[in-house]
């Protein structure tokens, strides 16, 4: 039986923050003090929620979105889970409905992760994932799949429909109580999924 890992992309597989930070700096925007503990982009840059959301959408639909680096140790362990343990990945990302943005995302993942991703599902920029997760959970092929996220609300939505949840830790979510495991990096995720618990991720 084929094994699946369903995962968010930005802040889990790819380092969206790094790419966005460089892009914002290029456009003359500076972060506020303590930005790393803020999830909302407006709060990070001292602007309104609407202004922040508009810039996120603009960035997500720019050419820059096709050149994001891997997050932490994602490249090594995603490929290892796919090539050694035969897991297939499904991306569920609130990137954009723009078809060119999706094509750039697929190309970015292919370049870094090879053939690990079987499918890339793009939702509207910043959209919640409840309905998409319910739809995936209704398909027998994804039964018992892992679900990896960095946004607690989305993690809980996946756990609620039956997926096994892992949250990637960041400054903005480190004090949040979650119904699932918390990983600091992909080595933690790899060890948990393969039950090689040398550095067991903690549950909170």
Predicted regions and their residues:
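Metal-dependent phosphoesterase signature
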Residues: 30-31, 39-79, 85
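Substrate-recognition "cap/lid" segment bordering the active-site pocket of phosphatases
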Residues: 94-145
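Substrate-recognition element of Asp-dependent hydrolases with the DxDx(T/V) motif
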Residues: 65-70, 74-109
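Active-site neighborhood of HAD-like aspartate-dependent phosphohydrolases
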Residues: 1-52
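A generic structural motif
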Residues: 81-89, 117, 143, 163
């Amino acid at each position: 039986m084929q094994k699946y890992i369903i995962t968010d992309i930005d802040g889990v597989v790819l380092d969206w923050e790094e790419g966005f930070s460089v892009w914002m700096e290029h456009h003359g925007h500076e972060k506020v003090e303590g930005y790393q503990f803020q999830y909302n982009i407006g709060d990070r840059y001292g602007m309104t929620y609407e202004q922040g959301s508009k810039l996120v959408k603009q960035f997500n639909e720019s050419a820059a979105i096709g050149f994001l680096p891997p997050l932490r140790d994602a490249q090594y362990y995603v490929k290892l889970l796919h090539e050694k343990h035969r897991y297939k990945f499904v991306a569920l990302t609130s990137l954009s409905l723009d078809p060119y943005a999706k094509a750039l995302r697929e190309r970015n993942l292919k370049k870094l992760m090879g053939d690990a991703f079987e499918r890339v599902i793009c939702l509207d920029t910043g959209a919640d994932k409840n309905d998409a997760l319910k739809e995936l959970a209704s398909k027998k092929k994804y039964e018992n799949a892992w679900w990896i996220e960095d946004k607690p609300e989305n993690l809980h939505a996946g756990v609620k429909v039956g997926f096994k949840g892992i949250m990637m830790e960041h400054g903005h979510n480190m004090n949040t109580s979650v119904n699932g495991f918390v990983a600091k990096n992909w080595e933690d995720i790899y060890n948990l999924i393969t039950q090689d618990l040398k550095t067991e991720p903690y549950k909170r």
